[in-house]
Amino acid sequence: ESTSSAEASSKESKADTAAIDADGVFTVGFDQDFPPMGFVDDNGEFTGFDLELAAEVAKRLGMEIKYQPIAWDAKEMEIESGNIDVIWNGFTITGRENDYTWSKPYMENKQVFVVSKDSGITKVEELKGKKVEVQADSSGEKALAENKELSDSFAELITTADYNTAFQDLEMGATDAVAMDIIVAGYQLKKRGDGKYIILEDEPIATEEYGIGFKKGNTALRDAVDATLVEMAADGTLKSVSEKWFDTDVTTIK
């Protein structure tokens, strides 16, 4: 019974998708410098947790997947113009609730600071008078803009195009801390190894949820994707993909 129900749900999803996206291509907009959610691997291929989920959703909907790298600060223009169908790349719902048609939240996240281990900084309050770097138009930048007391205590708040640059600046001593998503921070620290960096977890800047952003009003495609993600949660696919990238299940869809 559950199998036939899932099959019926999948068929309905495909019908909805065909109605809303005639070319049969599922175009995913993402920041290609945002590992582990979406990035370019050592072989020059697009990969990442979110991109792997998106590919499986497209497959189940009978659509062709297309990965479309975008400038993160141009994401709204990209989706409004129809260049992409979704923004799926560690995309925070919090603070953007009315800007897009949203999927169900599929992950929880926090905004935190990363510092060099040898900096001597162990608490957020010790960032007073320090240089802090954050990605332009990111959730971290928005969270700091809303916490003026904290951001005004810094000597300088610098914006950068991507987090690879931010980590280079941190390593060279050009900045004292980087504000970023804890999910991404954990991956970066594991990848870079050697215990060179630490996450300041005593006082998160903000707590938030990740979702998939669709053009406002595109509820048919949103509903098809949501139904497919519920399917993937039920059959264990979300869990297995999550464990591949994070060694644990970080997803929240039931």
Predicted segments with their positions:
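Bilobed "Venus flytrap"/periplasmic-binding protein-like clamshell domains
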Residues: 32-35, 46-59, 91, 112-164, ...
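A ligand-binding cleft/hinge motif common to bilobed small-molecule-binding domains
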Residues: 74, 90-99, 143-148, 171-172, ...
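Extended ligand-binding regions for polar small-molecule ligands
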Residues: 52-60, 131, 136-138, 211-248
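Extracytoplasmic small-molecule ligand-binding "clamshell" domains
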Residues: 12-90, 224, 235
